[in-house]
């Protein structure tokens, strides 16, 4: 293609959306590398310590959209210390100094401050989209800066963040000239909401397609918001624990009947059962339903709601739905592609007889032939059930099974679940993400290494017998990018068997395993392009006291590839070898 002008090649590159494919294109020749450098507008960085912002900007000076991840995935399970790192401020400072035309920023598991948000809002004149997922460190003062200064804002999406509500009036900071908003999600905010300011904002946003409210927005306000935004496609409702008065209910019904375009519904943080019938008219068009926080919707009310959603492709639900409820899903939702079943009692404090089991999983797999992604928290499982699921749904690309009790065997035969998970990886040739649990031996990892050729991310908890289990995975899964292990018997022999393997991976996490400080030191000596972090939260003992005892087991090991060396913001309890 050397005879094509650069402009033509650049136009061809515009049709290549995959970050992985764009990376491959840039390696073909110097000419393509240069063209890709100046034409790349979107960049994804899965680890904020793999590169620094200055190097990123030199590589892609025309950057407009940046996705950045901070803490490891196990931070979602409270396994990463609170102040470990993942600070976004150095990135925003560098981007501001470089004067790149940043328009979109997506952050996940990062520390974001009000100062960072204020700098972001003042540095990029055409900034349009901010998405924060599982972030912490900021308040509504920072959101007020974004609202006041980002005059072209189209998207403000706040998901699962820890936000201090210093000022409930942040919505009032959107100027009257702000009419560009297309997506607004503040469901994770716990404080009061300026309903009047919200109504004015929604009324002057004709292109608003997605609106997700927090629990402070009352039912009568919801009706008014829906009346002035009938174009919504995605709606997240708040908390309605009191029975509605007839007038409010009638207004809500009138507004909902106009919603012919709505395709996604979520929320219901608390809800009175009599409120639900108002939403029945829109259920027939829904393709996405998220009830993962709707603990109050149970029994016949939940079943009735599900039975009306015949076109669902995506369902997030609590395990209180029970196996009978999942059977209704299987009989009703023939287009279902993604299912997530979350635990309603995460601490195990209740005798939850409604929890789902292998019966519900088999029913779903038999009734939903298009299913390709599942997250399933359950109290028990059998090999026979997993074998049936593998036969019914061979198109899984994500299969995450979390049995709530560690080391729990097949509850009928009392055998390990090796054969069941083995059937999954054998049948599902396109499997890219897998989480395993229950009683598992090294045999299951032999199966994974042999058959999971496309696997990119594997999560292991309380599993395995010896170092062989981890070696089977590392030797067999050539496309593995992220491997995370907790409370398993893998040690130095597995860690050090093929150090070069980690050069092709994004990261390795091991906590409460058999790895020692000496093993980590040897790994670091042989891997100059890897950061080897030892995390010891027990500051009373002090890391210095144990650092010379190479037989000392490490609490947590986080290993990741980097091109910029050791990070400078590690807290005292993190030692980088």
Swiss-Prot record:
Domain of life: Eukaryota
Pathway membership, UniProt: Protein modification; protein ubiquitination
Tissue distribution of the protein: Ubiquitous, with higher levels in flowers.
Primary subcellular site in the record, as a coarse category: nucleus
Binding site for 1D-myo-inositol hexakisphosphate: 69, 108-109, 340, 398-400, 433, 481-482, 506
SUPFAM superfamilies named in the record: RNI-like
Induction: Repressed by miR393a (microRNA) in response to flg-22 (flagellin-derived peptide 22).
Domain F-box: 1-45
Region Interaction with auxin-responsive proteins: start-end pairs: 76-77, 343-348, 402-406, 461-462
Site description Interaction with auxin-responsive proteins, residues in chain: 134, 160, 377, 486
Localisation: Nucleus
Molecular function terms from GO: auxin binding; inositol hexakisphosphate binding
GO CC annotations on file: nucleus; SCF ubiquitin ligase complex
Pfam families per the UniProt record, alphabetical: F-box_5, LRR_6, Transp_inhibit
Keyword terms, alphabetized: Auxin signaling pathway, Developmental protein, Nucleus, Plant defense, Ubl conjugation pathway
InterPro entries, alphabetized: COI1_F-box, F-box_dom, Leu-rich_rpt, LRR_dom_sf, Transp_inhibit
GO terms, biological process: auxin-activated signaling pathway; cellular response to nitrate; defense response; lateral root development; pollen maturation; primary root development; protein ubiquitination; stamen development
Domain notes: The F-box is necessary for the interaction with SKP1.
Subunit structure: Part of a SCF (SKP1-cullin-F-box) protein ligase complex. Interacts with CUL1 and SKP1A/ASK1. Interacts with Aux/IAA proteins (IAA7 and IAA12) in an auxin-dependent manner.
Function: Confers sensitivity to the virulent bacterial pathogen P.syringae. Component of SCF(ASK-cullin-F-box) E3 ubiquitin ligase complexes, which may mediate the ubiquitination and subsequent proteasomal degradation of target proteins. Auxin receptor that mediates Aux/IAA proteins proteasomal degradation and auxin-regulated transcription. Involved in embryogenesis regulation by auxin.
The name this protein goes by in its record: Protein AUXIN SIGNALING F-BOX 3
Annotated organism of origin: Arabidopsis thaliana (Mouse-ear cress)
Gene: AFB3
